[in-house]
Amino acid sequence: MNVTPVELLISDCDGVLVDSEILAERVVLDGLAAHAPRAELEALLHGTFGLTTRDIFALVEQRFGITLPPALFSDLRAQAETLIATSVEPIPGVKRALESIDLPLAVASNSLRHSVESSVRRADLVARLAGHIFSADMVAQPKPAPDVYLLAARTLGVAPERCLVIEDSATGVRAALAAGMRVIGFTGASHIPPSHGETLSALGVTALIAHMDELPATVARLRAAASGGQ
């Protein structure tokens, strides 16, 4: 078990700060339904949240042996960004939870920076994050590659093993673990299937929470364990 001190808290954005994954999924499924059977699309994409839209397109093209129209990618991404920017709600309790934790905070997301900034504003976390926003368009490879998490740690001058991550997706958990960081799995967003906690546990998360009210105590417990406090 990693017992080095925790010096930086890094949060995913979609599905952790804001309840956006279900909105993006709706847009993508509606857009792809003209090109493949919807029921089969839903089965294929079940549990793929956390992937970039481009990775989802590649998955669909491979599975159905089709080539999607080049303009569809940008159209659906724009639709999803607009819907999220105007309609997304913060995850219940996230602002209160993050403001009660006395650690520097960053966000590391598979979305584009302008989209992450919009979601941060919707969650009223601009001041708490203090500009520490890291996104897929800032790195060579998106999650599940560790690039965006490593960039956050490097920029803030914290060793990866001293970072604690909050993630909702298997994709994000794999990225954070590949970066050498500890992970708290969050299963409280509206898109999360009932068995998802088991999936995240099997990947190796350090702890699981189902509501943001649990986050401060969970972080405190992990910090105490690292310092020999329990």
What are these regions (language model features)?
Residues M1-L44, R63:
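Active-site neighborhood of HAD-like aspartate-dependent phosphohydrolases
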Residues L29-L32, T52-T67, S119, A153, ...:
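Helix-loop "lid/cap" segments that line or gate small-molecule binding pockets
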Residues G31-H35, G93-L103:
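A short, Lys/Arg-enriched amphipathic alpha-helix followed by its capping loop at the start of a domain
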Residues V16, S109-S111:
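Conserved phosphate-coupling serine/threonine residues in phosphotransfer and NTP-handling enzymes
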